[in-house]
Amino acid sequence: MPKRTDIRKIMVIGSGPIVIGQAAEFDYSGTQACLSLKEEGYQVVLVNSNPATIMTDKDIADKVYIEPITLEFVTRILRKERPDALLPTLGGQTGLNMAMALSKNGILEELNVELLGTKLSAIDKAEDRDLFKQLMEELNQPIPESEIVNSVEEAIQFAEQIGYPLIVRPAFTLGGTGGGMCDNQEQLVDITTKGLKLSPVTQCLIERSIAGFKEIEYEVMRDAADNALVVCNMENFDPVGIHTGDSIVFAPAQTLSDVENQLLRDASLDIIRALKIEGGCNVQLALDPNSFKYYVIEVNPRVSRSSALASKATGYPIAKLAAKIAVGLTLDEVINPITKTTYAMFEPALDYVVAKMPRFPFDKFESGDRKLGTQMKATGEVMAIGRNIEESLLKACRSLEIGVDHIKIADLDNVSDDVLLEKIRKAEDDRLFYLAEALRRHYSIEKLASLTSIDSFFLDKLRVIVELEDLLSKNRLDINILKKVKNKGFSDKAIASLWQINEDQVRNMRKEAGILPVYKMVDTCASEFDSATPYFYSTYAVENESLISDKASILVLGSGPIRIGQGVEFDYATVHSVKAIRESGFEAIIMNSNPETVSTDFSISDKLYFEPLTFEDVMNVIDLEKPEGVILQFGGQTAINLAKDLNKAGVKILGTQLEDLDRAENRKQFEATLQALNIPQPPGFTATTEEEAVNAAQKIGYPVLVRPSYVLGGRAMKIVENEEDLRHYMTTAVKASPDHPVLIDAYLIGKECEVDAISDGQNILIPGIMEHIERSGVHSGDSMAVYPPQTLSETIIETIVDYTKRLAIGLNCIGMMNIQFVIKDQKVYVIEVNPRASRTLPFLSKVTHIPMAQVATKVILGDKLCNFTYGYDLYPASDMVHIKAPVFSFTKLAKVDSLLGPEMKSTGEVMGSDINLQKALYKAFEAAYLHMPDYGNIVFTVDDTDKEEALELAKVYQSIGYRIYATQGTAIYFDANGLETVLVGKLGENDRNHIPDLIKNGKIQAVINTVGQNNIDNHDALIIRRSAIEQGVPLFTSLDTAHAMFKVLESRAFTLKVLD
């Protein structure tokens, strides 16, 4: 079937900000789809609120709107653009839910907009739990015994009929949001209440738990001619009961018999055909390990996290082909872009094993509930490719960047057997390491299988690794054993640890013995056809398939898995850097380990190495490719952390040199640099012991800001107000030592702003200055940033530009740099300098129209700023106002406190742009799903130090129609100062009128809660904040943010004035 000619303009809805359950995979799929549609000659209009994505670059679609993905704004854009069709299946759950809302509100019908890819009826049947149940019954596909409920009472009734355990699955939600497993009525009531609240259609499916079955996924494609194929099947290491996004996953499935595979494959193809999906679809199934009995768990009628994984695992570009199918092309007439000789109708074949491992945020959220269940908690993932399970698993392990290079974590030797077995039974994020430890202690596979329901096949593979550890320990420096363990994916570092020598010695010994990796191609066809894909993975085999060209090459290191503090912004910078390298006439090579991102799309670079970002793996690629140099600036802390070892190994690092990186990161050197340049900074000291820290704080005076050196995202950063808290921090939060000093700084309360700049060693370009709405004390990644600055005087701006120039030249920066300033009493202080790309780079690139990563890359390669058209120093400011606002995933992370502070907690960002600050703020809040009505009730429960400022804020909220509720201390202060309030209780104050109840009953429209440093662990305040998050009520833990929201509400209100 030829492509359709009756449609000309297509609108694509993106997935919005990155949250747990919906990460960079939609940037990858959305980018692919937009380019694929443009390739076919269609005009593409894109709507997405996330500025950190490649997808929202001007050249990806014909028209790009970075606007809130809400009914109000998408409808406005539809009315303005009048597209012929809408493609919602590439924007994750956000895109699907928006399509449903547009349809239900009659917008699509009114504007005569056709839905492409997956029809509304199919979305409804897959997402509406009742319709899905009916369809499965019609197809004779087994599903667990279940009931659709719209109230808690109905859920209890069903539970009384069939008993526990049960699983709650809310309709139309993402990543298992609001769902969970229940073993009793109390848990059922709690989870169903949250689930109904979070489901846009107030509906939950309550089903009999089949936890313990094998979880298998099939990624399937279908076109309008009813051609259908399986792209890839995948098997979860963890059984049903743990969200697939939180599970280790292998592709292809490892333990299925031919009969089982055929059974599940037929079911998946029957389902996609019955739903008449045109494009990609993910089917999740549960298989009884002891019979051929299976159940259909869920169907995602769209491109998903699993399809991004399947695309990267096979090389088959699902999103690109889904877009072509959506406009009428069929699988048997589209050429497979990898082989360039076969058609897309050929099912991919794999001659390797892929392992995906989730990356959890618990290194930042130590108080978080680590127990895994049906609600997703991972922020990102890594993928590794090997010739056997052991190899791919160990490569994935060391890709995670959690301080491990093997399936062993520190201090497990000291864990008692009781604790060990409890950790294995409980299924937390680190269970894999405890399983390996149990095998080291000779627990039987049968025992571990019965505790976990993990297939014995996988446990046996772990036992192979453990037995090889033992073999290594008993045969020190044995070359044959070395060869054997390298084949199974052991790292040089792990071997060195077992042999009690250093990593360099293992590396040299291995190289002398000729034990070197070769690189194999990912070609979709297990080498059956010729393929020209420049997509490689390492293994210890015979033939090397990565041929080195004569062209000079540059290696760019990516940023690894998405985690809090290092998100998709760094992938954005990596992709742009590669573009500039290619434009400069070099061969661009990317090395990265993240399957979700655009940078690991093989069409982006001249060569892609899908490998862990460790010294060993990077050096192996460098030894083979012999690049002109390596660019580290765009890979976040991941790449920067490799600088020292690469430099020592003689690798040419391009851009700012190691000694200058050190001068910015090393406290003493940095202080000396600032003093030499005559630039003020808050007084501070470095401490390597508890006593040193206490002495430093006494000299500076409390409060002080404490943090470890060399971290990203403010990890373990804290504001400390007294000696007791400081001693507690030094003994629990960090392990200070001469190698790992702790920085102690005076905490200045003032206005914070930051600058991204490009330096060529002689001149600098500052695309823009960003002013933070929240004052210092809230991490810059969690602050709302405004460009251009709205309240900075010309003198302050000139000072910032002057200090930036001095620092760029004084630190010999070549390429990108980010500087953070605090302004107190009209004096500018430098807080920190990062001589690399920062997370604000995509936002600033979008709003200034300067492709910063590209300019910086060309400068790194030797170009000068005078050869560009952007001039020097501060670039002229935009006449629009642009706001970058953080987005959080607290609903997914029970027990994580939503109070903002110096440690970063946001997972993503949105952007709001308009002609003035109030309108831009309105858009930013709407895009971040922080919506407040024009009137209602607002609760104030604030710290004593904030009461005076909070009073003024409460007065202005009252002036626009809000009723002020306050807890006792706040209410007494407000009443004494002439502001009438409604007194509310916190908790346990023998009063029905307490805040969590009021929030639950819909009586409260917003909560303003601030806490002094000495009361951070206040239990009542924690529960109030948690209640607001769970019920979706706007929560402000900074008065500055609450004031920004007031500006929005005020701008929407009319002035009501008594006649004089």
Curated annotation (Swiss-Prot):
Residues 547-929 are annotated as: Carbamoyl phosphate synthetic domain. GO terms for biological process: 'de novo' UMP biosynthetic process; glutamine metabolic process; L-arginine biosynthetic process. Its cofactor is Mg(2+); Mn(2+). Residues 930-1060 form the MGS-like domain. ATP 1 binds at R129, R169, G175, G176, R208, I210, E215, G241, I242, H243, Q284, E298. Binds 4 Mg(2+) or Mn(2+) ions per subunit. Pathway: Amino-acid biosynthesis; L-arginine biosynthesis; carbamoyl phosphate from bicarbonate: step 1/1; Pyrimidine metabolism; UMP biosynthesis via de novo pathway; (S)-dihydroorotate from bicarbonate: step 1/3. Residues 402-546 are annotated as: Oligomerization domain. Mg(2+) 3 binds at Q820, E832. Mn(2+) 1 binds at Q284, E298. It catalyses: hydrogencarbonate + L-glutamine + 2 ATP + H2O = carbamoyl phosphate + L-glutamate + 2 ADP + phosphate + 2 H(+). Mg(2+) 2 binds at E298, N300. Residues 1-401 are annotated as: Carboxyphosphate synthetic domain. It holds the Pfam family CPSase_L_D3. ATP 2 binds at R707, A746, L748, E752, G777, V778, H779, S780, Q820, E832. One of its GO terms (molecular function) is ATP binding. Its EC number is 6.3.4.16, 6.3.5.5. Mn(2+) 4 binds at E832, N834. One of its GO terms (cellular component) is cytoplasm. The large subunit is composed of 2 ATP-grasp domains that are involved in binding the 2 ATP molecules needed for carbamoyl phosphate synthesis. The N-terminal ATP-grasp domain (referred to as the carboxyphosphate synthetic component) catalyzes the ATP-dependent phosphorylation of hydrogencarbonate to carboxyphosphate and the subsequent nucleophilic attack by ammonia to form a carbamate intermediate. PANTHER family: CARBAMOYL-PHOSPHATE SYNTHASE [AMMONIA], MITOCHONDRIAL, CARBAMOYLTRANSFERASE FAMILY MEMBER. Belongs to the CarB family. Large subunit of the glutamine-dependent carbamoyl phosphate synthetase (CPSase). CPSase catalyzes the formation of carbamoyl phosphate from the ammonia moiety of glutamine, carbonate, and phosphate donated by ATP, constituting the first step of 2 biosynthetic pathways, one leading to arginine and/or urea and the other to pyrimidine nucleotides. This is Carbamoyl phosphate synthase large chain. The gene is carB.
